[in-house]
C-alpha cells in the first residue's frame, strides 16, 4: 500500500475556487471511479496551497484507477480544462509515500 501526497499551487486569488472545485467536482468524480481519497487540505499560512492524499493498494490498482479517471471523457473534456484555469500545472508536486509499520495509516 502507498499514498500519493499531491500538492497544488492555485493561480493568484483562485485558491478558494480551486478548493471548492476539488471538493465538489474532482474528488466526488474520482471517488465514483474507485479512487480512495483520504484527506484534503488548504495551507494555513500558504495562501495558494491545496493538498490532497490518495491511497492505493498496489501499482496495478493505481494504473487501473488512473486509466478510469484520466481516460474518461468527463475528465478530458470538462474537468481538466477547468482545473487548468485554477492551478499552476508546472508547480504540481506529487510524492509517493509509504506509511511506517506503526503508523495508524498502515
Task: Mark where each language-model region is.
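Basic/polar N-terminal segments that are highly enriched at the extreme N-terminus
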Residues: 1, 105-106
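Short coil/turn motifs at beta-sheet boundaries
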Residues: 1, 45-47, 87
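Short, structured motif recognition centered on aromatic/hydrophobic residues
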Residues: 2-6, 18, 29-30, 50-54
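Specificity-determining recognition surfaces
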Residues: 98-104
Amino acid at each position: 500500500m502507498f499514498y500519493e501526497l499531491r500538492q497544488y499551487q492555485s493561480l493568484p486569488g483562485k485558491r478558494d475556487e480551486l478548493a471548492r472545485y476539488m471538493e465538489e467536482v474532482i474528488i466526488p468524480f474520482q471517488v465514483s471511479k474507485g479512487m480512495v481519497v483520504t484527506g484534503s487540505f488548504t495551507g494555513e499560512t500558504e495562501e495558494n496551497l491545496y493538498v490532497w492524499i490518495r491511497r492505493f493498494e498496489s501499482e496495478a490498482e493505481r494504473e487501473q484507477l488512473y486509466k478510469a479517471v484520466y481516460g474518461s471523457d468527463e475528465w478530458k473534456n470538462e474537468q481538466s480544462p477547468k482545473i487548468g484555469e485554477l492551478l499552476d500545472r508546472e508547480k504540481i508536486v506529487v510524492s509517493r509515500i509509504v506509511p511506517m509499520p506503526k503508523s495508524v495509516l498502515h
